[in-house]
Amino acid sequence: MGKIKELETSLANKIAAGEVVERPSSVVKELLENAIDAQATEINIEVEQSGVSSIRVVDNGTGIAQEDLGLVFHRHATSKIVADDDLFHIRTLGFRGEALASISSVAKVTLKTCTDNENGHEIYAENGKIIHQKPAKAKKGTDIQVDSLFYNTPARLKYIKSLYTELGKITDIVNRMAMSHPEIRISLVSDGKKLLSTNGSGRTNEVMAEIYGMKVAKDLVHISGDTSDYHLEGFVAKPEHSRSNKHYISIFINGRYIKNFVLNKAILEGYHTLLTIGRFPICYINIQMDPILVDVNVHPTKLEVRLSKEDQLYDLIVTKIREAFKDKILIPQNDLNHASKKNKVLETFEQQKINFEKQQSQIGETSAPYVHDQKDKNHDVESHKNNLDSTSSTNNESTEVSNELHNHIDDSYLQSQKEVLFDMEQNTSNEYEISNQQSNDIKGTVSQTPHRRVPYMEIVGQVHGTYIIAQNENGMFMIDQHAAQERIKYEYFREKIGEVTNEVQNLLIPLTFHFSKDEQMIIDQYKDELDKVGVHLEHFGGHDYIVNSYPVWFPKEEAEEIIKDMIELVLKHKSVDVKKIREDAAIMMSCKKSIKANHYLKNNEMADLIDQLREAEDPFTCPHGRPIIINFSNYELEKLFKRVM
């Protein structure tokens, strides 16, 4: 008798379900996608015990016809594709017909549905089989309840992390879906606590205000652009709101949340020197394209996709993000009361914390944006209401957020797009204005230059030979003198190095390099890559190589180190990025040739430095992304000294 046997349907379904239903958030994702595909305008999600006990998703979409109910829990039964060619023109979020079959294989599922022309029906399934089907009262749309997840696969429960972590992953999914579909009213409730409620206004920035808080939302900058194949829309937050991981980067293609290394790299390249190493932006990028240019049928979770013309999209993202910040004032507002505010927010959060039985795990920063940033949102909205002496109750928070956004409108975008967005730079044109007479009366000040992003300021002095202190009518400024000159010199060296061709400089004494046998084989294979950039390696016997010349733009004292870096790139990536090498060289030279800490300057030298900084293309961060200027507002100074409460 043969050893190979066909698995029973129930066992095969459980195995297949492992690919689709990894955890409670997987169930929420699949049901939410189905509701969106059903053209719902309102979706309500309720979970208990982070979805382990129950998950309920109610929508007002088209509903499921009675004649189709018998197939809803069958594997590969779908209304979204019919022929092979449909796979290359997918515009729906779901298409495989696996979700409900997989969920019903590992949970108890009750589905109520009603269409426009029929009465309601209820169907109940467990262990992948329909137990009963009957008429039932139901509103138009679909109501799905998933109970006792993994009840028949207890081994899977062992891999469920803390309830806080699982809730974080659920809120992450819901938040991202809400951002990509702002026209849908979406609410999320966990154990009776409302975690998210969007108003369905169609404005993504209002959804981001709900998720990240008003402080971040007011510093969002709109981006938009087109190529022959792609249309790009999105919001990018100012660098001061950066985070310590990539979790806050949200990329969507045709409304589908995806993860893509190349597009992530494009976003970081767009911010370029505005972010320090290890910091990542908050951003929302939505890309519309012909479905034939993207393959979403790569992975069961549909998170990974393959893109055509990826380079074109990369360049578009980089260009639009750089353009977004080109004319913006990016001086971070220092919060002198950050510590006390943080403590108050933490206290508030502790009081509102969801009561999970016997759960003591902490929320990590990698949990959902809601869990991480809701604290800031609660505080920001509350403090803003206090500033306006608002009498609105906290129950109207969604209305409060929506109303606040309408007070910050970018008129130019309103005219072109007929949408309401934030005025990302409200009053920046006159925020730092000062009369010509005042400018002439002040000695030892930096001259005012029109159309420059660095504001007028009067030099006051220097602290520890490191930080320049300046002031204007709006407050006090601290300038890192090393970072300021580093930015100035970086832009100078970047331009000069960029102008130089691959003309080489011959050496009297060659540089010698030794490699292992494995490295030697790679270098011999890819030596042409080094030749293209002016580094000519010659075999010198054994495992030794010599270099008799290198490009004239190499800094003489760093030439050997740069060549080593190039060779490392060849060994690791089988290629050399000349642009990056030149960039790194400019950064290296600017850092070494800039004034250091504990270097005391005269007032006129400080003024000259600020004047030069004003002429810089990006005057707010050094090449490594560290801030150059920090602003202390008059209000914050007065608050520090208890002059205001």
From Swiss-Prot:
Organism lineage: Bacteria, Bacillati, Bacillota, Bacilli, Bacillales
Under Gene3D superfamilies, the record lists:
3.30.230.10, Histidine kinase-like ATPase, C-terminal domain (3.30.565.10), MutL, C-terminal domain, dimerisation subdomain (3.30.1540.20), MutL, C-terminal domain, regulatory subdomain (3.30.1370.100)
Q: Which residues form the signal peptide?
A: none
Q: Which family does it belong to?
A: Belongs to the DNA mismatch repair MutL/HexB family.
Q: One MF term in GO for this entry? A: ATP hydrolysis activity
Identify the stretch(es) annotated as Disordered.
371-403
Record protein name field = DNA mismatch repair protein MutL
Tell me which PANTHER family the record gives: DNA MISMATCH REPAIR PROTEIN MLH, PMS, MUTL, DNA MISMATCH REPAIR PROTEIN MLH1
Example of a GO cellular component annotation carried by this entry = mismatch repair complex
- What are the GO BP annotations of this UniProt entry? mismatch repair
UniProt entry keywords in alphabetical sequence: DNA damage, DNA repair
What SUPFAM superfamilies would the database entry show?
Answer: ATPase domain of HSP90 chaperone/DNA topoisomerase II/histidine kinase, DNA mismatch repair protein MutL, Ribosomal protein S5 domain 2-like
